[in-house]
Structure formats: C-alpha cells, structure tokens
C-alpha cells in the first residue's frame, strides 16, 4: 500500500480545503474562488443560509422521517442534493417548495428522493429501473410506452410502500412545530435534513422525534430475557464472581455467561461448535448430579 506523506502545513491545507468545499459546495462551478472571492461569498451567503435553511426528508404516512436527505443523497434525476438549488434569499410561499436541479440539461424541476434496493435503483411496476424514467414531472418511462408514470411497490423498512411516502421540504419553524429536531445552525451547503450523526440511520432505527422515537420507560426497565442480545444477557447481572441461579435450580457463573458471546476471530461454524460442546458438558455435569438443566439459548445476534 502506498504511503502518503504531507509537507509541513499540508494537513492544515487539506482541512482548509475540506472546509471550503463544505461551505461553497458546487457554487464555484469547479473553479476555486480566490481568497477575496471566498470572503465575499461567505459574507453574502452564510447569513442567508443560516436564516433560511430548508430541511428535506422522505416521510412515511405515519409521520416518521424514514430518510433524512444530505448533500450526497441522490435525486430521482440521479443528481445529488447538493447539485440542486438549496439557498434562497427569501423562502418561497408556495408549498411544496421546489428545489430544481442546477445541472445543465437536466429536466428535474424539484428534488424528489427515491430509495435504493441495496445498491440498485428500485423498479417501477413497468419492470424498468427508476433511472430509466424521465426526470421531468410525471416520471414517464423512457424504455416502454405502457408506463403512465413511475410507481414502485418497493416496501420501506417502516413497512409502508415507497409510493405512500413523500419528499418533504420544510422550514425550521415548520419542523419545530411538529416537534422534530433541527440541530445546530451550520454554515455548510445543502445540509438538507441532517442534524447529527444519528441522521445517517434509517428512520426505524433513529431514537429521536424524527424517527421511531425513544423507547418507553417500561421497555428500558424491563427484565433481560432470552430474546435479548447475548451481551445484555451476560452483563445484566451484578458484577460478582458468585454463581447466578437459573431456571430449574441450576447455577451459572460469569465465565459461563461470557461464553455465549461470539469471539472476534470466530466464524459461524466455530461459534456454534463451541456452543454445542459447552451444552454437552453441561448435560454431562447435570446427569452426574442427577438433574438435567434446560438448554440455554444459543441464538446469535
């Protein structure tokens, strides 16, 4: 592997360029601003960006933001969110707010998120991929004449079909009125709906008001069961070397509890074989004592 070395001050120069790219985005047209142009750009754009930021999300009928759009998130037109118009001197009054694509020749008039199926575009009911459809409003298919417009039955992780979701563009005030997080004010371009690291997760995994929400106190205080993660099953008991009683009157110590955890170097076969051998030993030891314990759960996480 080739090793990269930087001259003195090189790391600082890289950080400055990354900061420049996050602030300017695509506004320089591929040609770096001069220091004077950069300062003038920041004086003009940053106050407007902080005041009139727009939050973009892909929302399910239940109100959950299944996807929070960021700078690199692709539109139906296959261009990224940062390649669309995202800065406004005054926020438009009409709803929904249209964010047209700025790429030359693109017919996209408004940002429209479309999910991926793994790494591939999802299919329309006409059997063609999303990127085989026109980016113009109506989203007709370019590969067939029977399609009346893109319509996919792809099911989101929230359980709702893709066609039931909407791409929502809203202001800070509109988002706060719904109790959804808005994060801190940042000067970066095309931040969309990103408000923190958790924004990168899917909605059903996000434990804030934009996702599935925080678990209830009852869930947090509930006892650890055999259905929980092996780490929780091993660590929920008090940290003591005394053996812990199990169902049926059997006892197991911390070392036995920890054995249910997968070791970093183990593959699936080695993990299940080790669990099987430990179960055999427990059965033999129990038979010698005249009792057979229930087999512990070995279901991996």
From Swiss-Prot:
Region spans: Disordered: 235-271
Superkingdom of the organism of origin: Eukaryota
Spans traversing the lipid bilayer: none
Family: Belongs to the FAM221 family.
Descriptive protein name: Protein FAM221A
Taxonomic source organism: Mus musculus
Gene symbol of the encoding locus: Fam221a
């Amino acid at each position: 592997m080739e090793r990269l070395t930087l001259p003195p001050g090189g790391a600082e120069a890289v950080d400055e360029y990354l900061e420049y790219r996050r602030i300017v985005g695509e506004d320089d047209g591929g040609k770096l601003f001069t220091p004077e142009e950069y300062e003038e750009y920041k004086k003009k754009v940053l106050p407007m960006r902080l005041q009139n930021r727009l939050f973009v999300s892909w929302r399910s009928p239940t109100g959950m933001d299944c996807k929070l759009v960021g700078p690199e998130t692709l539109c139906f037109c296959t261009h990224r969110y940062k390649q669309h118009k995202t800065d406004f001197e005054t926020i438009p009054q009409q709803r929904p707010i249209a964010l047209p694509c700025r790429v030359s020749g693109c017919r996209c008039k408004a940002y429209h998120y479309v999910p991926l199926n793994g790494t591939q575009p999802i299919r329309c009911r006409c059997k063609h991929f999303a990127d085989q459809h026109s980016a113009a409003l109506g989203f007709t298919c370019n590969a067939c004449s029977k399609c009346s417009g893109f319509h996919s039955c792809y099911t989101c992780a929230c359980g709702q079909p893709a066609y039931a979701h909407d791409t929502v563009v809203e202001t800070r005030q509109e988002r706060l009125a719904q109790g959804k997080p808005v994060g801190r004010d940042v000067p970066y371009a095309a931040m969309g709906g990103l408000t923190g690291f958790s924004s990168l997760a899917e909605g059903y995994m996000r434990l804030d008001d934009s996702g599935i929400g925080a678990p209830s106190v009852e869930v947090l205080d509930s006892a650890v069961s055999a259905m929980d993660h092996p780490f929780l099953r091993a660590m929920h008991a008090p940290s003591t070397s005394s053996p812990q009683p199990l169902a049926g009157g059997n006892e197991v110590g911390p070392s036995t509890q920890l054995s249910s955890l997968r070791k970093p170097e183990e593959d699936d076969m080695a993990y299940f074989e080790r669990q099987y051998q430990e179960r055999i030993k427990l059965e033999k030891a129990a038979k010698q004592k005249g009792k057979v314990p229930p087999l512990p759960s070995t279901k991996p996480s």
